[in-house]
Amino acid sequence: YSTIHKEFNITTERTWRELNGEPCVDMTPEETEKKQICCSRSFGEMIKTLDGLTKAIATFTTIAARKLRKQNSCASAISVFIQSNRFRNDMEQYSNSAIRIMEESTADTSMLLNAAIKALESIFRHGISYKRAGVILSGIVNDTLVQPSLFISQDKRERRNNLMKIIDTINASSATHDTIHIASYEPVS
């Protein structure tokens, strides 16, 4: 070992050590936080109503927010997208998306849901049969790095964060993972 160290450069030394069974490069993958979280689905039956799409978007937002909190992160924006069945040329084709920037980066399901519903309402068109929809959370940062808003009190922020933790704990212990959900929607299975 000392001869190799004296005679060759560090790359050659590491190669020699690796060939002799001594790992020199850490091969364990680092767990990186996601830069975006997407939750979407194609529907078995097409959805024609705003109410039907609202329930689907609410479910997707709830799932995405749960993933966000699981990695101790917050999102500064939420995008909603909807599209008709592109394989059905006999039907009117439509796809659109909208993004809402949050007042403050958050992982609060109700705040994200309010923004998602507003985005959905801005792009929904009556008379279209929708086949696919989804949400994308972006602008993701670690929850310790969130720039607080001047318009949201620290006390309110802490209460909301504690509420989300309690809801996640209860839901994690249930078989369906949606024992407790936002009252304005029913989870879509």
Where are these regions (language model features)?
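DNA-contacting surface of Y-family translesion DNA polymerases
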Residues: 1-129, 145
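Acidic, metal-coordinating catalytic segment for phosphate/diphosphate chemistry
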Residues: 94, 101-189
